[in-house]
Structures are given as structure tokens and as C-alpha cells.
């Protein structure tokens, strides 16, 4: 960006009357309460999900490690989101009558941008790690079960590299000139930001297709193993593959839905262009933080899937143990059938 363009952006220090009214409105204050509530609920379920993974784990060790890292990453992302929203509301109270102090200079938001977008990209690319984990589990079963932590760490490193590359393409060398309504808004000069969002969406769609196919293969394989194998270890491994693949499918669908909500919503807002005021655009956009919603979905899937699986296991055990009564009755029945 040339110096003239930077100077032009820096000159737009004061919020317009329409934007100023929006940033100090009741709707924006409600948005802060709403997003903060989402974040606080996600904290509770993240704690419950981590406890479930550590105490009542139904996933493989590789999948569990990936999920725990993703949960910890989501804590940072959610905290950044809530901190910026609370700070923006505080600013709207403090400078309600001074529109020239309502906005943030992009250069003052560097730390927030780093935390928000890096953790956001990391959350998105978790679907790649989980999908790859399922593929290795299905096609290289023996290697998978003997090298689970190596596989998980390798996939997390790749996930981190994808995150850093995406952040580099979107923001490296981008001028931080200009002003933004909230500190997590990307700089106006970040022209590659939309391209990276498109790539992220395509990655999630591909991962959903691959994971769905892997889930189908896992179900098919589990049915075959139930017919021909009496090994408890082999049967449990097949059941674990189904449970994990199903959970990953659910998570990717929810993640994709949340991100598409933001992507489609923002694209529609941009298409409307001049037909929509800046204040209305900002108000609607603040209700569309897809990754924040996705970071609530992840612990919900883990926690409730764990509870459901444990309940189903107890039910099956109860059916099996009550089918023939106690051991004495079963032996007596066998003796009678042998006479």
C-alpha cells in the first residue's frame, strides 16, 4: 500500500454518525452479553470435555491428544474474543459523546490480531488433523495403534504449519493503517484475507467428505469383524473407530456450519455494499463470529458423545448379564442342555 492510501486511511479517525450510533446502541451491548455468555458456557463445557477425555476416554490416544490441544487452543480464542468485546463496550460507554475516540487504530490491535487469527486458523485446521488421524487409523491400523502419540504430534505440527502459512499469506507485510470498530477486525489492507477464508472452507468440505467415507468404511469393517472375529481387542478397536469417526464427522459438520454462517453472512453483507449503512453492517457482523460458535460445539460433541457412549455400554452390559441370569443359573442351564 502506498503512502497516500495509508494517509487516507489514517485520516478516517472519527466514526461516522451512523457508526457511532451503532457502536453505542443497546443492540451492541446485547451482543457483548450474548457473545460473553457463549464464551462462558464454552469454558464450562471445555472443562467437562477435558475431564471426560482424561477420566472416561472413548477415543484413541492419538485422537484424544489432538482434541485436548484443540480445546486448550479454543480457550485462548474465546478469551481473546470476550476481552475485545468487553473492551469495546467499555470504550462505547467512556467515549459515547466523542466519535473520534470510539474507533481503534489497527496498529494498536496487533496482539489481539495475532491471538485471534492464529487460534482461529488453528481451530479450523483441526479438522485436517482429525481427518488424517481417522485415515491412518483405518488404513494403517497396526502402525496407528503402536505409534499413536507420534502420529498425533506429527499431525499437530502440520496443523500448526498450515496455521502459520495461512496467517503469513493473509497478513504478512500488510499495513496496519486505518481504524477499526473492534480490535479483532482484520486490517483494511489485508486483501488476501478473503482468499484464505475460501481455502479454509474448501479444506473443511474435503475433510467432511473424506471423514464421511472413512466412517462408512469403519461401519462396514466393524460389521465384518463382529461376524468373523471373537477377539475382544479387535472388536473393541473396530467399535472405537466407529465412535471416533462418527464424532469427528459431527464436529466437522458443526464447524463447517459455523464457519459458513460467517462466510456466507459476510459475503452477503459485502454484496449489498452501499445499500447497507456502515452501522448496520458492523452490528450484523458482530453477531457472526463462526469460530467462537464452533469452539462451543467441540466440547459439546466430546462431552455428550462420551456420556452417550458410556450409557450405551452400560445398557449393553446390563442386557448381556441379564439375558442368562447369574453364573450359577447359566451353568445349570448348560448342564441340562448337555444331558
Curated annotation (Swiss-Prot):
Tell me where in or outside the cell this protein is found.
Answer: Membrane
Q: Which residues cross the membrane?
A: 33-53, 110-130, 150-170, 199-219, 250-270, 284-304
Output one GO MF annotation: G protein-coupled receptor activity
Source superkingdom: Eukaryota
State the Gene Ontology BP annotations.
Answer: sensory perception of chemical stimulus
Q: Please provide the record's keywords in A-Z order.
A: Membrane, Transmembrane, Transmembrane helix
Could you tell me which cysteines form disulfide bridges?
none
Q: Does the keyword Transmembrane apply?
A: yes
Tell me what topology the record assigns in the membrane: Multi-pass membrane protein
Looking at the UniProt record for this protein, which Gene Ontology cellular component terms does it annotate, in alphabetical order? membrane
Q: Which family would the database say this protein is a member of?
A: Belongs to the nematode receptor-like protein sra family.
PANTHER family for the chain: G-PROTEIN COUPLED RECEPTORS FAMILY 1 PROFILE DOMAIN-CONTAINING PROTEIN-RELATED, SERPENTINE RECEPTOR, CLASS A (ALPHA)-RELATED-RELATED
Full protein name = Serpentine receptor class alpha-22
Please state the gene responsible for encoding this protein: sra-22
Amino acid at each position: 500500500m502506498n503512502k497516500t492510501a495509508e494517509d487516507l486511511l489514517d485520516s478516517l479517525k472519527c466514526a461516522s454518525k451512523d457508526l457511532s450510533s451503532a457502536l453505542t446502541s443497546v443492540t451492541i451491548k446485547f451482543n457483548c452479553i450474548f457473545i460473553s455468555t457463549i464464551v462462558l458456557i464454552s469454558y464450562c463445557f471445555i472443562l467437562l470435555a477435558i475431564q471426560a477425555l482424561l477420566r472416561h476416554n472413548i477415543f484413541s490416544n492419538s485422537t484424544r491428544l489432538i482434541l485436548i490441544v484443540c480445546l486448550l487452543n479454543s480457550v485462548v480464542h474465546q478469551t481473546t474474543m470476550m476481552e475485545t468485546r468487553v473492551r469495546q463496550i467499555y470504550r462505547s460507554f467512556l467515549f459515547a459523546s466523542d466519535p473520534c475516540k470510539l474507533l481503534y487504530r489497527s496498529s494498536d490491535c496487533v496482539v489481539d490480531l495475532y491471538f485471534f487469527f492464529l487460534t482461529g486458523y488453528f481451530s479450523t485446521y483441526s479438522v485436517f488433523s482429525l481427518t488424517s488421524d481417522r485415515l491412518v487409523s483405518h488404513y494403517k491400523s497396526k502402525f496407528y495403534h503402536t505409534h499413536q502419540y507420534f502420529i498425533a504430534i506429527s499431525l499437530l505440527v502440520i496443523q500448526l504449519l498450515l496455521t502459520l502459512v495461512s496467517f503469513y499469506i493473509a497478513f504478512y507485510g500488510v499495513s496496519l493503517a486505518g481504524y477499526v470498530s473492534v480490535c479483532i477486525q482484520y486490517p483494511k489492507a489485508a486483501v488476501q484475507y478473503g482468499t484464505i477464508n475460501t481455502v479454509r472452507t474448501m479444506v473443511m468440505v474435503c475433510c467432511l467428505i473424506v471423514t464421511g467415507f472413512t466412517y462408512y468404511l469403519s461401519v462396514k469393517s466393524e460389521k465384518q469383524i463382529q461376524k468373523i472375529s471373537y477377539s475382544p481387542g479387535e472388536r473393541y478397536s473396530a467399535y472405537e473407530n466407529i465412535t471416533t469417526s462418527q464424532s469427528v464427522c459431527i464436529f466437522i459438520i458443526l464447524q463447517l456450519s459455523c464457519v459458513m454462517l460467517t462466510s456466507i453472512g459476510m459475503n452477503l453483507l459485502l454484496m449489498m455494499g452501499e445499500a447497507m449503512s456502515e452501522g448496520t453492517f458492523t452490528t450484523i457482523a458482530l453477531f457472526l463470529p463462526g469460530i467462537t460458535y464452533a469452539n462451543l460445539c467441540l466440547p459439546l460433541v466430546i462431552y455428550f458423545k462420551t456420556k452417550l457412549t458410556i450409557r450405551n455400554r452400560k445398557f449393553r452390559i446390563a442386557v448381556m448379564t441379564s439375558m442368562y441370569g447369574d453364573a450359577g443359573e447359566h451353568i445349570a442351564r448348560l448342564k441340562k442342555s448337555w444331558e
